[in-house]
Regions:
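Internal helix-loop-helix
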Residues: 76-167, 213-215
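Extended, charge-enriched "interface" segments that sit outside catalytic cores
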Residues: 1-107
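Internal maturation/activation junctions in enzymes
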Residues: 146-194, 198-202
Length: 316
């Protein structure tokens, strides 16, 4: 085929850089007690700017998740299929300690170093930062129920990413999600109608819906439901201890303008099994501990997006 024109005045692809090559970021980390983690941050930043990771980001964004409500034989499965690049990004984020590892790292500046890593890594691909952030944020809320925290916190903090649908306590590492919003209860979750009925074994049966739940393939979720005492926080696993799927039905995925690599689902619960977290009737106070942490990560993610955009513009 003959050449019709010569490509000129086009910037080469932006790759082979470090998102941690940021004087203000590193100065702040050193100043506030996280200097011991600088080498880890630099290594992660170099990986975030590598051709390999930028290709993962491109593929994850170009191939949005797909919902499979049933398998080929007609069995209900409620699974979301992600591009392999999504799982590669998730594994790298978890292995580098951006999830709940900071809670187990008994060292001054652990949360600062984790925040710097999250900021540097989010410049590669922001969508998968959602479940990473929620896993980090779940820990302080879960600590309102010490027995559950003792069982689940080590797995939330483990540097192992395992996407297989198995009982949470049979896995080596967990991802956590959060479900609050209902059709009539977004900003005001007190209007939520999803009901929680006590069972004889201390668990509760959840019936109702959630209108917007991101990362629906998480292993466990902190949710709000109306118990007899009022709005209460619960821990709801995707897979029950006996290996059966919990009764949470993924109705459809949201068609989103941005954040397309990450799935956000509409969910219905048909007597799904969950365990109470914190004081009954004080669910908002309990789950707000998780909300606050995710909002801090929203700031980090937004700053990362602005930094990535600036870098791209300057390169061009």
């Amino acid at each position: 085929m003959s050449t019709t024109h010569e490509v000129q005045n086009q910037a080469p692809p932006l790759t082979g850089f470090s998102t941690a090559d940021d004087a203000a970021l590193l100065e702040a980390v050193r100043r506030d007690g996280g200097g011991w983690g600088e080498d880890e941050i630099r290594a992660l930043g170099a990986r975030a700017g590598s051709a390999e990771v930028r290709d993962w980001a491109r593929m994850a964004e170009a191939s949005p998740p797909v919902l499979h409500t049933h398998d080929r034989y007609g069995h209900r499965v409620d699974e979301v299929e992600f591009h392999p690049a999504w799982h590669q990004l998730m594994a790298a984020a978890v292995e580098s300690g951006q999830h709940a590892a900071a809670w187990a790292r008994d060292r001054p500046g652990a949360h600062l170093v984790r925040a710097a890593k999250f900021y540097a890594w989010a410049q590669a691909e922001p969508g998968h930062g959602c479940p990473v952030s929620m896993t980090y944020a779940a820990v302080p809320a879960l600590r309102a129920q010490p027995d559950l925290a003792a069982a689940y916190e080590p797995l939330l903090a483990a540097a192992v990413y395992d996407s297989a649908p198995r009982p949470p306590l049979a896995k080596r590492g967990l991802i956590a999600g959060m479900s609050m919003t209902e059709k009539q209860g977004g900003s005001d979750v007190r209007a939520n109608t999803t009901a929680a009925v006590p069972a004889v074994d201390g668990s509760y049966l959840i019936t109702g819906h959630k209108w917007f739940t991101s990362a629906p393939m998480s292993d466990v979720f902190l949710i709000l439901a109306q118990a007899p005492e009022g709005l209460t926080c619960f821990l709801l696993p995707r897979v029950l201890p006996d290996g059966t799927r919990n009764a949470m039905r993924l109705m459809r995925l949201k068609d989103k303008l941005g954040n397309r690599s990450n799935a956000s689902a509409e969910i219905e619960y048909e007597q799904a099994v969950a365990w109470p977290v914190g004081e009954p009737g004080r669910g908002v106070r309990t789950i707000v501990e998780m909300v606050n942490m995710t909002r801090l990560d929203c700031v980090l993610g937004s700053a990362a997006g602005m930094r990535a955009g600036l870098r791209q513009a300057l390169h061009h």
